[in-house]
């Protein structure tokens, strides 16, 4: 079952963490790992103006793997997580009828 989630990440202090993180996420390895947990073509990104953090609206098809991915427990994600990420929060989203 597909679940829509919001991941909000904060980077460690210092220069270049945003660029390094995004470079990994857009690399072949990063894209392959993302495809294992979510539909990457449906992902909607957002960036804080000072590049100290990011958020992604993600359509997840493997919730447990997503939790491992954003927590740094995924072996492919761990090195970039350890170097660049201070924290990531994960939220479940549900659509609200405004009509």
Residue ranges of each PLM-predicted region?
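Short S/T/G/P-rich N-terminal loop/turn motif that feeds into the first structured element of a domain
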Residues: 1-76, 87-99
């Amino acid at each position: 079952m597909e679940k829509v989630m919001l991941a909000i990440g904060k980077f460690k202090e210092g220069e270049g963490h945003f660029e390094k993180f995004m470079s990994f996420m857009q690399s072949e390895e990063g894209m392959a790992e993302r495809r294992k947990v979510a539909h990457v073509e449906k992902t909607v990104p957002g960036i804080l103006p000072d590049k100290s953090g990011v958020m992604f609206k993600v359509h997840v098809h493997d919730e447990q793997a997503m939790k491992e991915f954003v927590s740094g427990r995924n072996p492919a994600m761990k090195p970039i997580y350890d170097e660049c990420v201070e924290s990531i929060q994960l939220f479940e989203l549900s659509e609200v009828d405004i009509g």
